[in-house]
């Protein structure tokens, strides 16, 4: 089975969210930022203080953003 390479860099994921139409809705405690989409339901929370995102957290972000893993 082939491995899909998903970027786990915080800046790149933030750029992907912005490119998909997600807008910064609010800043949470510490370096956490919540993104909101004008059409899609829910919010995506991203820790902007970390350089890399753990795989499980990244997968959760993909689910919240309604992206295919």
Task: Give the location of each predicted region.
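Basic nucleic-acid-binding interfaces
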Residues: 1-31, 36-69
